[in-house]
Amino acid sequence: NKDDNYADMTQFMIGTANDYKFTSRDFKALLKVLNGEIPLVVEVSRATDILNILKFSESQQIDLVLWGAAEAHMVADEIAKADVPVILDPLDNVPRTFDSLNSTYENVIRLDQAGVKMAFYYSQGAGSHNAYLATQSAGNSVAMGLDYITAMKSITSNPADIFGLVGVGSLAPGFDADLVIWDDDPLELMTNVDNLLVDGIDQ
């Protein structure tokens, strides 16, 4: 339970436990999760595993974010009921492992229909490499039938909301003046950036 988790981490932090395989940085991050300061991001694919992690997060009373979630469409209603957001790549619709046998391009459509908040990323690269291709993922989701505004939110305001970032992700009074001006539809593959402003400063 949560009290035991606190006790274990406290024991580690004061140096009385030697059998942990985590660093102090790991435990500090976990403390923030348990305190509700940040969400726990879990990479998961199979529908059964998604249901299990939903039950776990509810029992521990922690905020959860699902990452990847190839079979989320199979349990979309349960995810929506738990009010858990999903970060996924709409283009990642081909089974790559046995954990994602039920991958489908309809994943984002079914999640949206269930009312699940989504954020998109581009999965074909390490870390943030090729992150700019998230617009391509969003554009493809629109081609698959997702509402345009929903797709735009999935690469702008939704990521900010999911991680509790204040003042970014939207254009509103008091928000950071971060703005990209495109020469056409930003979700079209051949569109280019005309101008970029960060904190209102032309880059």
What is each PLM-predicted segment?
Residues 59, 63-67, 84-87:
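Long, well-ordered mid-to-C-terminal structural blocks that present hydrophobic/aromatic surfaces
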Residues 48, 94, 187-188:
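Glycine-rich nucleotide phosphate-binding loop and flanking beta-alpha elements
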Residues 26, 46-49, 72, 104, ...:
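Amphipathic coiled-coil/heptad-repeat helices and related helical stalk/stem segments
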Residues 39, 77-80, 85, 89-93, ...:
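His/Asp/Glu-enriched, well-ordered alpha-helical/loop segment
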Residues 1-64, 192, 198:
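Polyanionic/metal-chelating signatures
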